[in-house]
């Protein structure tokens, strides 16, 4: 059976979100700053089902848009980062990084079960979620996601069987 790929260009398919984050102890990214992220996706697999799709574009975009909406206009906070000391996560997210104390309303935050909010970790999260959800419906062999922090600058993660 021949493998095929479908490709979704995030800038044209409107797969984007705007969010703030920080990379603790990084020289220039250690302060809260934001990006207008764009998410590109490639799905590889065997054509299957009634319509002979690798995966329905709509299904792929729906999953990506759901994740984008969770992140959009939020401060992305990785809960498993050892450099972040959390003192509270009830209604107000309180944490400390390198002596700097933060107190942010919970509704303005996206608490993520990740070690970092870097483009690399975000691309891994998108790819893993897509792979898991699409595998239950389609005969896919790999998912590649590029999370761009802006045009021309992104991180790619590929997950495969």
Swiss-Prot record:
Disulfide bonds: none annotated. Zn(2+) binds at residues 21, 33, 35. The keyword Oxidoreductase does not apply. It catalyses: 7,8-dihydroneopterin 3'-triphosphate + H2O = 6-carboxy-5,6,7,8-tetrahydropterin + triphosphate + acetaldehyde + 2 H(+). Binds 1 zinc ion per subunit. Belongs to the PTPS family. QueD subfamily. This is Putative 6-carboxy-5,6,7,8-tetrahydropterin synthase. It comes from Methanothermobacter thermautotrophicus (strain ATCC 29096 / DSM 1053 / JCM 10044 / NBRC 100330 / Delta H).
């Amino acid at each position: 059976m021949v493998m095929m790929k479908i490709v979704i260009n995030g800038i044209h398919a409107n797969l984007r979100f705007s969010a703030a984050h920080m990379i603790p102890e990084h020289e220039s990214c250690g302060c809260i700053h934001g990006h207008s992220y764009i998410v590109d996706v490639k799905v590889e697999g065997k054509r299957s089902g009634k319509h002979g799709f690798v995966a329905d574009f709509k299904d792929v975009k729906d999953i990506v848009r759901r994740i984008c909406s969770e992140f959009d206009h939020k401060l992305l906070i990785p809960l498993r980062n050892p450099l972040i000391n959390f003192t509270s996560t009830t209604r107000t997210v309180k944490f400390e990084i390198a002596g700097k104390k933060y107190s942010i309303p919970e509704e303005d935050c996206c608490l993520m079960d990740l070690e970092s909010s870097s483009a690399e970790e975000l691309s891994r999260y998108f790819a893993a979620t897509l792979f898991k959800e699409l595998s239950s419906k389609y005969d896919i062999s790999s998912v590649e996601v590029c999370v761009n922090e802006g045009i021309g600058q992104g991180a790619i993660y590929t997950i495969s069987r």
